[in-house]
């Protein structure tokens, strides 16, 4: 047994891992317990334009009815899971100040992140940008959950040789302060796309002198939850206006 394995085993005995959703003990160190894991729903059959699982998206045209009605500024969107049940509980806990939860959920993003980077043709010259919080919200929460999620996922990829080899063009650079939220926006609950888009209009901009770091580059915009696409669309608009080559969106979960 290696020293690392011995240390990890000892820590597990002293402080056993607990389910991210319900706090039950998970002796094998998994993120969710045996009772909560079955509730996780991998997102399948989703529209490549907005990541919404819909029966009306046309495989030939590649977009659903929503995407054809709304001219999103991002070129595609994907999510790892449907938002609900145990994952929703864990995300809510994360947003209520549990920073360690963001780091723990990060590995769930790895497969979808690898897929997004490969399909989008990303390389070392491109950038990953987390959706920013407003400065006031960041002070209240103490961290940006989107940043913590994608940072943990990228760290997992960088530490796994097989995953690094699968990215021959290299991993894109994480830009944590490239985009900023210029004003606070209201929580809109179950509001529809039109109301959400009106609320976030003009709420995002590039940081001063940041345009050079995005111009002619592919951008992967990452958030914890994709709801209607309004926030991602506004962020993508600011990035495209600064000269980004294109913007792809990735979320841990998609509200359906």
What are these regions (language model features)?
Residues 1-256:
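Glycine-rich phosphate/pyrophosphate-handling loop used in enzymes and phosphotransfer proteins
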């Amino acid at each position: 047994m290696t020293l690392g394995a011995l240390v990890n085993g000892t820590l597990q005995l002293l402080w056993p891992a607990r389910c991210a959703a319900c706090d039950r003990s998970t002796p094998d160190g998994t993120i969710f317990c045996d009772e909560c894991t079955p509730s996780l729903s991998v997102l399948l059959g989703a529209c490549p334009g907005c990541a919404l699982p819909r029966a009306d998206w046309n495989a030939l045209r590649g977009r659903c009815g929503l995407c054809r009605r709304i001219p999103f500024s991002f070129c595609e969107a994907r999510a790892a899971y449907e938002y609900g049940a145990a994952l929703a509980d864990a995300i809510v806990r994360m947003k209520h100040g549990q920073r360690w939860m963001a780091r723990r959920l990060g590995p769930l993003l790895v497969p979808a992140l690898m897929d997004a980077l490969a399909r989008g043709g990303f390389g070392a010259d491109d950038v990953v940008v987390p959706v920013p919080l407003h400065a006031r919200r960041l002070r209240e929460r103490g961290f940006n959950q989107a940043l913590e999620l994608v940072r943990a996922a990228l760290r997992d990829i960088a530490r796994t040789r097989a995953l690094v080899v699968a990215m021959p063009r290299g991993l894109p650079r994480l830009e944590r302060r490239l985009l900023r939220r210029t004003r606070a926006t209201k929580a809109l609950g179950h509001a529809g796309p039109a109301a959400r888009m009106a609320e976030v209009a003009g709420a995002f901009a590039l940081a001063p002198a940041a345009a050079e770091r995005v111009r002619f580059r592919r951008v992967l915009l990452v958030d914890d939850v994709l709801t209607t696409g309004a926030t991602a669309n506004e962020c993508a608009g600011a990035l495209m206006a600064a000269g980004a080559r294109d913007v792809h969106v990735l979320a841990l979960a998609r509200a359906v």
